[in-house]
Amino acid sequence: MAELSISPDEIRDALKDFVQSYEPGKASTTEVGYVLDAGDGIAHVQGLPGVMANELITFADGTLGLAQNLEESEIGVIVLGEFAGIEEGMEVRRTGEVLSVPVGDGYLGRVVDPLGNPIDGQGEIANEGRRALELQAPGVMQRKSVHEPMQTGIKAIDAMIPIGRGQRQLIIGDRQTGKTAIAIDTIINQKANWESGDTNKQVRCIYVAIGQKGSTIASVRGALEEAGAMEYTTIVASPASDPAGFKYLAPYTGSAIGQHWMYGGKHVLIIFDDLSKQAEAYRAVSLLLRRPPGREAYPGDVFYLHSRLLERCAKLSDELGAGSMTGLPIIETKANDVSAYIPTNVISITDGQIFLQSDLFNANQRPAVDVGISVSRVGGDAQVKSIKKVSGTLKLELAQYRSLEAFAIFASDLDAASRRQLARGARLTELLKQPQYSPFPIEEQVVSIWAGTKGKLDEVPVEDILRFERELLDHLHRNTEVLSQLKEKNVLTDDIIDAMDKAVDRFKLEFQTGEGKPLASVGSEKFEPAKAEDVNQEQIVKGKR
């Protein structure tokens, strides 16, 4: 038997040297987990005991995942990418980071996915850093009251449902009622502010497309490019073909990009089109993660899903740079049911809502805004003084017209005042019609609404109202300084009113109706006063009631 050639002292010295050479700082440990099952954009992972909520983890094939459910024996993970290659038993590791996206002015004019990667084929994007998706909204003391106007260029909205910078204004209605059209018109209307070069006027726009058809997103981009609005707009696209996890994250990506500009003292407009599809995607993810369902199978925290997103829209205080982010979330209803779960949630979170009615849309009243139930809770303080002055009675007149119109269907004889009110209401309703992608500057809106509410259009046939408006504005641009004065002062002075009055009266002498007749020869309808017996009969009926 061979003898041991190493003495005990040598063994002891070798062990001692090895122990003394150990440096704790150079040692590293890595938590490793394994995939239990995967499918439908979700994976369940065993291991990783130290993982944090919303931490990024990496699968062996390089795919990223977002840790959501932290349970005793496993983790529920949203797969951020192609999940077909993730198999049972695959190794998973922690990154120690939360999900973030690159931000900066390089994103203007680009189309990106919910992870901030460009998908428009125009190369890489130069970024100015990264910003976490889950950011705390500004606190009460970090905010300032909404006081600056955010013009949409749509007469019905700017006059009666004004929006201010930093406001959250919901656009709600059935499918195919023009919700996206209002949002796109609002983006296009910011072009003049952008071209002014004044950073206090410029508005950077973000359009977040959630669950839309790819062709729809392409048409939106095409419309913005044609209008020259893409240079100050970013599109975050999560089409219908994306996994549910991407649709859930897309609004937070857009919000993170916008917050970077907001905290830099700039103004941002963000459109979420639409949050109904985000809620449905979150419901799908939650059910796959085996979270307990609640009302309409939505998880219990679906209100928090939208509140923490929309609370990031704010007007910041002067100490923080006075930037703002205005939110226009869109919600799609079914059969005009605004009392459903998600619509009522978002209505309670936002600062007002614009209701679009399918009946009005089908009656060719476009934009199909129902002014009776639409409201802006904070935008009135931000409204331009000139438009505020001329539109003071507009909403009331339209409401009275709607109620009188319903009554007139059953009434054969109406008194002169009622017939006059019906005629005025029909012309005001026609005046509020507006073609898509044609936003009106605020000074033109003031002239149009002033002419309508002051009775200047009462002699114009209803079918000629829009042509009269168009030709009147051309006449004012060419022959007077009324529009330039309104644009410069934003206040309706007595001198401007007198100038408008004379200019409109002069134009009415030149205008010809669709039948080729001068407007002066048409005249307004002569309303006969109600007969005495009719008045007495009406009083008898009221007395019996």
Swiss-Prot record:
Enzyme class: translocase
UniProt cross-references to Pfam families, sorted A to Z: ATP-synt_ab (PF00006), ATP-synt_ab_C (PF00306), ATP-synt_ab_N (PF02874)
InterPro entries: ATP_synth_asu-like_sf (IPR023366), ATP_synth_asu_C (IPR000793), ATP_synth_asu_C_sf (IPR038376), ATP_synth_F1_a_nt-bd_dom (IPR033732), ATP_synth_F1_asu (IPR005294), ATPase_a/bsu_AS (IPR020003), ATPase_F1/V1/A1_a/bsu_N (IPR004100), ATPase_F1/V1/A1_a/bsu_N_sf (IPR036121)
Membrane topology reported for the UniProt record: Peripheral membrane protein
Catalysis performed (reactions): ATP + H2O + 4 H(+)(in) = ADP + phosphate + 5 H(+)(out)
A molecular-function term among this protein's GO annotations: proton-transporting ATP synthase activity, rotational mechanism
The EC number(s) this enzyme carries: 7.1.2.2
Keywords assigned: ATP synthesis, ATP-binding, Cell membrane, CF(1), Hydrogen ion transport, Ion transport, Membrane, Nucleotide-binding, Translocase, Transport
Cellular component aspect of the GO annotation: plasma membrane; proton-transporting ATP synthase complex
Functional summary from the UniProt entry: Produces ATP from ADP in the presence of a proton gradient across the membrane. The alpha chain is a regulatory subunit.
Record-linked PANTHER family: ATP SYNTHASE SUBUNIT ALPHA, MITOCHONDRIAL
Family affiliation: Belongs to the ATPase alpha/beta chains family.
Protein name: ATP synthase subunit alpha
Organism: Clavibacter sepedonicus (Clavibacter michiganensis subsp. sepedonicus)
Protein encoded by which gene: atpA
